[in-house]
């Protein structure tokens, strides 16, 4: 049930007045001056801004405040969404994306003809081909108006996905599923896992979008695990659970993102039934999470077993060439909105070399440059390092030194570092020395001869014997295994 438009605008005016009082006039003008109310339903408020950068900033810094203020206006509000104006979503047929040369918005569609839904996140893993004015709309759902899908961002397509060695196999499997549909049973279910910001969401949404383009009437649903839980809980509350489950079982392709967040015994039980029904009916299922199926310990064992029965593919961090291509595309996208933007190729290359973490870290770096460029147009590489130091440090591997390992092991076993380097063969010295050699081999790139030299000029065979000795003991000695884990944590904490 939607609020009357006049009432909605009055509520929005009251909210913006409160917001301005809370954050101050200067911050309000900078970040909320172009905020507009798009829609208010029974439990969801949708606000819009003109750019993806504004949306990301508001979502990252003011989402909780906006939700709090709207709930003061209406306690029934459960969620506040901030979207980019002119970009919409979701589950049935996809309109072709427009380029920045043809970015005029299409004529409005009446609510009876189409249902338009909010977009997902912007740059979120390797999704850098933003296109203004593009739209993905959904055919009206059943007479109840029920909508199954989570936001599907039209910028997340195979064309805008930056491929490379770290994701090429997963991309090939994703394309096969999107093109072959239910005939791609050898990939069923397909499970894609990766750390945050490496392109899982982009890849999953690209599958859904391509499947819709391939077959206009395809029954495709993209869901996040959290959205599934929310919809299921809402359906139970409204005595509509049976209808909700029947709708989900009557689809051709189910795409589930962030599976690690699926919680609750009853909800997992229902999801297990859904998974079994779809797989047994040769319907395609694609799932993504931040770890492999076997490591999702919070999931019901039956769900894990089903997920392990398909193909699991890992997406790794992007290499330098991929990172540079992401930045180039992101700059081209930003220039569609502001042609005066100019970040030199040498700056982009430097950022690609130094920010080696996830795509989201790369986006954060780019947004920093974009923000600074407006009042520091001739930014230098030294200044870039200063601005992005927190990101470059986070992306660098920790440097672990053998001397630090020796110091921490000696302190733990209450011996001196000189004892570790000496020729003494007493039991109280031999064990710590072997542990230190083992950790040096496991935690540093040093060769066996180099480690031997650092331990009083010992031969490499002595180091090899120590490593094998500890490896043999650790399987049967729980106390030793715990000691090694503790020592590893201490060493990592001290690493630069």
UniProtKB/Swiss-Prot annotation:
Plays an essential role in the initiation and regulation of chromosomal replication. ATP-DnaA binds to the origin of replication (oriC) to initiate formation of the DNA replication initiation complex once per cell cycle. Binds the DnaA box (a 9 base pair repeat at the origin) and separates the double-stranded (ds)DNA. Forms a right-handed helical filament on oriC DNA; dsDNA binds to the exterior of the filament while single-stranded (ss)DNA is stabiized in the filament's interior. Belongs to the DnaA family. GO terms for cellular component: cytoplasm; plasma membrane. Oligomerizes as a right-handed, spiral filament on DNA at oriC. One of its GO terms (molecular function) is ATP hydrolysis activity. The keyword DNA-binding applies. Keywords: ATP-binding, Cytoplasm, DNA replication, DNA-binding, Lipid-binding, Nucleotide-binding. Residues 151-373 are annotated as: Domain III, AAA+ region. It is found in: Cytoplasm. This is Chromosomal replication initiator protein DnaA. ATP binds at residues 197, 199-201. Residues 76-150 are annotated as: Domain II. It comes from the Bacteria. It comes from Brucella abortus biovar 1 (strain 9-941).
């Amino acid at each position: 049930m939607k609020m009357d438009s006049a009432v909605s605008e009055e509520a929005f005016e009251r909210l913006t007045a409160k917001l301005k009082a809370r954050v101050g006039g200067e911050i309000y003008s900078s970040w909320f001056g172009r905020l507009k109310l798009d829609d208010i339903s029974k439990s969801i408020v949708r606000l819009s801004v003109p750019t993806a950068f504004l949306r990301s900033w508001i979502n990252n810094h003011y989402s909780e405040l906006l939700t709090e203020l709207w709930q003061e206006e209406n306690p029934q509000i459960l969620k506040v969404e901030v979207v980019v104006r002119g970009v919409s979503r979701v589950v049935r047929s996809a309109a072709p994306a427009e380029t920045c040369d043809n970015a005029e918005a299409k004529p409005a569609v009446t609510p009876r003809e189409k249902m338009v839904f909010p977009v997902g996140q912007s740059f979120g893993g390797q999704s850098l081909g933003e296109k203004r004015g593009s739209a993905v709309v959904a055919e009206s759902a059943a007479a109840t108006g029920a909508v199954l899908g989570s936001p599907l961002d039209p910028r997340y397509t195979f064309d805008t996905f930056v491929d490379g060695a770290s994701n090429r196999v997963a991309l090939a499997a994703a394309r096969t599923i999107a093109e072959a549909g239910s005939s791609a049973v050898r990939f069923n279910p397909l499970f894609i896992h990766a750390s945050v910001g490496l392109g899982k969401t982009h890849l999953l949404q690209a599958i859904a979008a391509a499947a819709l383009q391939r077959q206009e009437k395809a029954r495709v649903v993209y869901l996040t695990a959290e959205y599934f839980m929310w919809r299921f809980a809402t359906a139970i509350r409204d005595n509509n659970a049976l209808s909700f489950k029947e709708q989900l079982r009557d689809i051709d392709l189910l795409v589930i993102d962030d599976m690690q967040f699926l919680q609750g015994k009853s909800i997992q039980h229902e999801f297990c039934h859904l998974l079994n029904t779809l797989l047994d009916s040769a319907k395609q299922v694609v799932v993504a999470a931040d770890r492999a199926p076997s490591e999702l310990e919070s999931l019901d064992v039956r769900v894990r077993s089903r997920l392990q029965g398909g193909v699991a593919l890992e997406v790794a961090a992007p290499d330098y060439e991929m990172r540079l291509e992401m930045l180039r595309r992101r700059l081209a996208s930003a220039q569609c909105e502001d042609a005066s933007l100019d970040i030199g190729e040498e700056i982009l290359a430097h950022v690609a070399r130094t920010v080696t973490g996830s795509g989201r870290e790369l986006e954060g770096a780019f947004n920093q440059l974009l923000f600074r460029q407006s009042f520091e147009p001739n930014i230098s590489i030294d200044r870039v390092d200063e601005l992005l130091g927190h990101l470059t440090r986070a992306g660098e591997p920790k440097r672990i030194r053998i001397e630090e390992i020796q110091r921490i092991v000696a302190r733990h076993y209450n011996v001196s570092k000189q004892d570790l380097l000496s020729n003494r063969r007493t039991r109280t010295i031999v064990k710590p020395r072997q542990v230190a050699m083992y950790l040096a081999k496991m935690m540093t790139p040093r060769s066996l001869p180099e480690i031997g030299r650092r331990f009083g000029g010992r031969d490499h065979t002595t180091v090899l014997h120590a490593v094998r000795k500890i490896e043999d003991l650790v399987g049967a000695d729980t106390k030793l295994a715990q000691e090694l884990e503790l020592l590893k944590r201490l060493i990592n904490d001290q690493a630069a």
